[in-house]
Every structure is written in structure tokens, then in C-alpha cells.
Amino acid sequence: PIDRASASAAITSGVAPYYNNIAGQQWLNRETLRPVGCVDDAKYSGINTNETASPNKLSTSTIGDELKVCTGGKAIEYAIAPFRDAAVLSAGHAANGAFWIDDASGNWCSSRFYFNALPSWAQAYNRLNAPAAKIGQTTWEPYSILASNFSYFMQTGPQNPFKHKFTGPQRYQQFKTSGLVNAEVTNM
């Protein structure tokens, strides 16, 4: 696997990209000569997002799909990830839902492939705790004082330790690539 999408598909399906049909996040459609996203699907619009998504390009089952089969459909399966491709490819075809953080709004979103509206608990989380509501006050800084002053490398560390605020139109994409997103995924 060469990127997040092909790695997610390989891990959850247990087979290489050759077999699961997910070679990367995007590939070139030979008929239209345009890039195609691995989970793009115009048949299934997004919920709380303008992005469309489904696992229909994934040609194999996932571990979650197999869990649904072996429990006669009784298993409850959700995939929660910062990124659309990781959530949808991890959820697979039979999941109860897949959730990711929307790049434009910073809210948790999903696809109509799984349901027509977010479950009430996800709607409540978006109202009370969505990344969009917290991102303005969020600053990433090194956890350890040693990391911020590099005292183990140099005799005197920098006077201004590194900090990063999430601002501007790319703030949600930046947040999704920071370590802080792990707590957000856990809380969701």
C-alpha cells in the first residue's frame, strides 16, 4: 500500500490492492481522463458535507462485513476516522455507519450510503463538542518541556517554544493531520 486509502483497505480487507481494487486515494479514469477518488460515489450524497462517499469501489469484504455475516447481522459496526477514505474503507459495505471530520465545516459527517441522517448521538456530539466549536481555542504544543527547549541537544534551548494554532481556511485539514485529532476520534 502506498497511501492512507490503500493501507486502510488492505488492513480491513486482509488482501493487497490488486485484489481489493483500492490502489490509492485517487486514480485516473481512462474514459474521462479525470481523477477519481477511491470512495467518491455520486449516488450517495453526504450528511453534513458536500462530499459523496460509499465503499462500492472496494471489491472485497472487510473484517466488519464478515463480522456482520457471522453474527447474522446482529453486530453493530461503526468506523470513525479523521478522513473520509479511512472511515468509509474501514467501515466496509455492511457497517452501521462511517464518520469523518468535514474539511469545510469541521463537523462530524457521513454518507447516505449508511443512513439518511446522522444518529441522534452523533448530532448531539456535533452540537456540543464538534471540532468546529473548539478549534479556535486549540493550540498544539509539545507535551514535554524537554521537547520544547531541546535541552538534551543544545546547552541553551530556543527562547520561544514551538506552538501551532489552527487558523485560516485550512484549519480543519491541519487539525486532522495533528496528534490532537486522536483525542477527537476517541471522544466521538
Language-model features: where?
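Alpha-helix capping/hinge segments and adjacent helical runs
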Residues: 7-8, 12-17
